[in-house]
Amino acid sequence: MGFSAPLSKDQASLLDERSREIFRRIVEGYLDTGEPLGSRSLSRLLPMSLSPASVRNVMSDLEELGLIYSPHISAGRLPTQTGLRFFVDAFMQVGDLPADERANIDRQIGPVAGHEQSLEGLLTEASRMLSGMSRGAGLVLTAKNDVILKHVEFIRLEPTKALAVLVGDHNQVENRIIELPAGISSSQLTEAANFINAHLSGQTLQELRGQFQTQRTELQSELGMLAQDLVERGLAIWAGDNEEGKLGRLIVRGRSNLLEGLAGEEDIDRVRMLFDDLERKENLIEILNLAESGSGVRIFIGSENKLFSLSGSSLIVAPYRDEENRVVGAVGVIGPTRLNYARIVPMVDYTAQIMARLSRKQR
């Protein structure tokens, strides 16, 4: 896709009615078919009477502004990444999700929660639903803080290092190597693990850590200083004080949707790069960071999203939050830049609301 510098507000305000109409038709044609629109086709589509020559003059002006480009000689025009962003910001109208689509989401996700299946089942169904309705890849992930603890163990590896093992409520296992306080004994390792296990009672990492912080005096009376230090180190690592510890569960459904309508080797390479990106844990942690940085649905087009910039993909993502307004996960759709943004944005927003409500019930 063509790339140019961002369009300033002053430049955008210079577009007259026919320029805006021609630009809008080019973008909508691209989002609908992926094909460029030429001057003859545009002259027939426009509500005003303009000759193909007049349309070409307007297209030339739009090209100078960096809003459209020609993919090859004698072809029609396609929107640049800057053009798509301008369209999303200035033209796109996002309304409420239609009642039938809300009902469809409720029908697909609701029964999973109603039958008290695992949170894993809820995540899977939400991802599958987003994929099916958007024709992109549906993505649902959770932050590590949302994992409910079942068992904790510390296994000494070296005098100054131990393997910290966490088992979640769905038997998912996380291993982390942690630095041990100097001089801590094997019995103190066991004491620290037993203390955590005795206080779990179905709490998340963040809840357990908060409890320990508010009951520091009681903690000091029950544990020695070294064991207390170890407990706090283990919880800090698991609860995501470092970036690696932030990601909990990830489910992506609908990768096959991204293979539909590929036109050539370049498109195949683009999708292959996207698949590779989805396997990198650091990229998925960044998705959580992107979701946390905004209060609602966020749209990242092409290289605006450094995660998937090489594959020329767009990401529409929204966080979902717990009762204390902490981000505990994100839902989204990944696909080509010609996603139906106006339709997918309210879909992702509504799904995030549903996930926030249902995930609390799963706790």
UniProtKB/Swiss-Prot annotation:
GO MF annotation list: DNA binding
Keyword Repressor: yes
Pfam families the UniProt entry points to: HrcA
Keywords, sorted A to Z: Repressor, Stress response, Transcription, Transcription regulation
A GO BP entry: negative regulation of DNA-templated transcription
Gene3D superfamilies reported in the protein's UniProt record: 3.30.450.40, Heat-inducible transcription repressor hrca homolog, domain 3, Winged helix-like DNA-binding domain superfamily/Winged helix DNA-binding domain
SUPFAM superfamilies found in the cross-reference section: GAF domain-like, Winged helix' DNA-binding domain
HAMAP family for this protein: HrcA (MF_00081)
Family: Belongs to the HrcA family.
Functional note: Negative regulator of class I heat shock genes (grpE-dnaK-dnaJ and groELS operons). Prevents heat-shock induction of these operons.
Annotated protein name in UniProt: Heat-inducible transcription repressor HrcA
Naturally occurring in which organism (per UniProt): Agrobacterium fabrum (strain C58 / ATCC 33970) (Agrobacterium tumefaciens (strain C58))
Lineage of the species this protein comes from: Bacteria, Pseudomonadati, Pseudomonadota, Alphaproteobacteria, Hyphomicrobiales
Gene of this entry: hrcA
